[in-house]
From Swiss-Prot:
Pfam families found in the cross-reference section: IGPD
Disulfide linkage: none
Protein name per the record: Imidazoleglycerol-phosphate dehydratase
Main location: cytoplasm
Gene3D superfamilies: Imidazole glycerol phosphate dehydratase, domain 1
Organism, scientific name: Leptospira borgpetersenii serovar Hardjo-bovis (strain JB197)
Compartments, as annotated in UniProt: Cytoplasm
Lineage: superkingdom: Bacteria
GO molecular function, one term: imidazoleglycerol-phosphate dehydratase activity
Keyword annotations from UniProtKB, A to Z: Amino-acid biosynthesis, Cytoplasm, Histidine biosynthesis, Lyase
Amino acid sequence: MTRRLIRFYDPVRMKAERKTSETEIKLEMNLHGTGQYRFDTEIPFFEHMLSHISKHGLIDLNLWLRGDIEIDCHHSVEDTAILMGTTIHKQLGDKAGIFRYGHFTLTMDEVLTTVAVDLGGRYFFKYTGPELTGKFGIYDAELSLEFLQKLALNAKMNLHVFVHYGDNKHHVHESIFKALGKALRMAIAQDSATAGAIPSTKGVLE
């Protein structure tokens, strides 16, 4: 199996492609956008979840995806997370002036979820909450954890997701992705009080 990742960096937006024997993905991302998105993935529920990251994170996303969904959606979701995470890490550059940390507690009907992130360059992922099982159309619910883990790994991000309580599986998913968008928005934002300094006593972030 061949893997290729092509990245084009500029301060405003990033275009990236990933092509393997299982998937082909084209992505354009602007971390400092207005929450505009356009998806063509053939996986409707996945698009629905990604739209929440975009809208609530004010991250512009343009995603085209073709994968081996005749088998299942695993490769498509996993490879999208790899590409998105890599793109986030690359676009942040040296991370000068950003807040670095972000957290948000979000309610959706009976569900309460907290998401916390640290963009300091050290990977960790922890999910606490109800087991994610079942299907939404062709999308297996447990793929959301695969997406979050691979996103955090490739963005070199510390990501904690805590679903305090809630029963409706759709609401649980929405609360996670919306809160993630909100937390990323906080972490990526420029902190005017730091005058563009690196947000670490080490003076450098990977």
